[in-house]
Amino acid sequence: MESALARFDATVQRKGIVLQPDGTPDEVEGVLNPACVRVRSGELLMYPRCVAAGNVSRIGLTRARGSVDDPSFERLGYALQPDMPYEVRTVPGGMGCEDPRVTFVPVLDRFVMAYTAFGPDGPRIIVALSDDGYTWTRLGPVDFAAHGLPVGDDKDGVFFPEPVRSPSGMLSLAFYHRPMKKLSTMNGHAAIPTLLAMPAIDRESTRIAYVPLASVQADIANLLVPTESTIVLAPDGAWGRLKTGGGTPPVRIAEGWFSLYHAVDAVDVGGRYAMTYSAGIVIHDLEQPHIVRYRSNAPVLTPEHPDELHGVVNNVVFPTGIDVLEDRVFDVYYGAADAKIARVRMELAPVAAAAAGETAA
């Protein structure tokens, strides 16, 4: 385990909108919050959440065309559509397959997708697998109950690409998740004062869950059965005081596991709370990711552009996809105001500059 980082600098350049609704019924309420991954051929695939009328979500399949600096995305259909019982509801309010993240896991030699199913039991994390990134097979819902872990509404599943050590020392595959408070899902904005009055550790916090690697290698179905889970990002910093959630799949850099996460602030405006979704950097220890080496003391990406300020849900940047271009240079794909998909180019400072000094965003 290495020491905490006192400073970590990055530059962020907005590159604009890369995908927006095409006018068809399946996208009338937005395209947003995409996964992305380089498949074995080197092609970049992106998996947008496509939202039809009534908040019915599907996971699209698109392929990048053009140059790295100016990609366009060709629609190829859908990776997953809501047809399982845990994805289908008969009451108003929406249903479907939401907010995917995709990670290639070499030890499994497979692409692993985690997404949120919005069905009769509420939001649940589902895992799907693919050999090529094009054709996906559902493994099923994550079973947190099997080992007495938090059970209920849960979102923001994101897998780490390599085995790590759990808090107990078990070599494991790991994934982010974010259990939700029942009053949050039932009462919406009305629950915000109650949530903010709670101790930060009791608000909606990002956790890492761990699945013993040996059990998964014995039976891939065990990927759904985590044995440990621990809080890694409580909403206890200078920003994002309402809740935090996992964002992009972690990427190995010299300092640790690098990821962008989202966090939410709520401000009372004339008796109604206005929420802002921003993004920050987190770096986890490479061997024991429950140890956080660095966390942004200010957002690195906040809603500023009109496409981020005004949409289906105003004031939202929601990073979910990352494409590694070269060492310490990434394209990050994110949902803008729950309506469109945008891209930023992020470049991390050289390793030497991240060793000491004042904390930076």
What are the roles of these predicted feature ranges?
Residues V312-N315, P319-I322:
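C-terminal structured domain segments
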Residues R101:
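Glycine-rich phosphate-binding loop
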Residues M1-E29, N33, V37-M95, F104-G157, ...:
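Beta-rich carbohydrate-recognition and catalytic domains
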Residues T244-G246:
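Catalytic core of Fe(II)/2-oxoglutarate
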